[in-house]
């Protein structure tokens, strides 16, 4: 079996893991009510999407 010859240093480990990060979700302001919502999704506050009321409240 393959066994590491040297211990992996903290620096080398951290450099390898630079791309393992959580991305921030794209938040936009709802043009209807002004609340922040996720992009390309129905607004939870007023139920509108793309200027039309999709979910009645």
UniProtKB/Swiss-Prot annotation:
Database matches in Gene3D superfamilies: Single helix bin
Protein name: Large ribosomal subunit protein bL32
Family according to the record: Belongs to the bacterial ribosomal protein bL32 family.
Any one of the GO BP annotations: translation
Alphabetical list of Pfam families matching this protein: Ribosomal_L32p
Naturally occurring in which organism (per UniProt): Staphylococcus epidermidis (strain ATCC 35984 / DSM 28319 / BCRC 17069 / CCUG 31568 / BM 3577 / RP62A)
Domain of life: Bacteria
HAMAP family: Ribosomal_bL32
SUPFAM superfamilies: Zn-binding ribosomal proteins
The keyword Zinc belongs to this UniProt entry's keyword annotation: no
GO molecular function term, any single one: structural constituent of ribosome
Lineage: Bacteria, Bacillati, Bacillota, Bacilli, Bacillales
């Amino acid at each position: 079996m393959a066994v590491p010859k040297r211990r992996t240093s903290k620096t080398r480990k951290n450099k390898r893991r630079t791309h393992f990060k959580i991305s921030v979700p794209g938040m936009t302001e709802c043009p209807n009510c002004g609340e922040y919502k996720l992009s390309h999704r129905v607004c939870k506050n007023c139920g509108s999407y793309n200027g039309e009321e999709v979910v009645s409240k």
